[in-house]
Amino acid sequence: MAVQQNRKTRSKRGMRRSHDALTTAALSVDATSGETHLRHNVTAEGYYRGKKVINK
């Protein structure tokens, strides 16, 4: 098994972890139904950019 030669410093550990942060989801409110949904996605009611695109 591999064993490290030298201990990594707090600085190097922080530099490695700097890209691990999670981003919040970009949400939008539909103009027609007022429903909250993910950006660039159809709402649960089937609306996209104010128009009905899916019939349930």
From Swiss-Prot:
Keywords: Ribonucleoprotein, Ribosomal protein
Residue intervals passing through the bilayer: none
Gene Ontology molecular-function annotations: structural constituent of ribosome
Keyword Magnesium appears in the UniProt entry: no
Compositionally skewed regions (Basic residues) per UniProt: 7-16
Record-level GO BP terms: translation
Pfam assignment, any one: Ribosomal_L32p
Region (Disordered): 1-28
Gene Ontology CC terms: large ribosomal subunit
Entry-linked SUPFAM superfamilies: Zn-binding ribosomal proteins (SSF57829)
Family: Belongs to the bacterial ribosomal protein bL32 family.
Protein name as it appears in the record: Large ribosomal subunit protein bL32
Protein source organism: Vibrio vulnificus (strain YJ016)
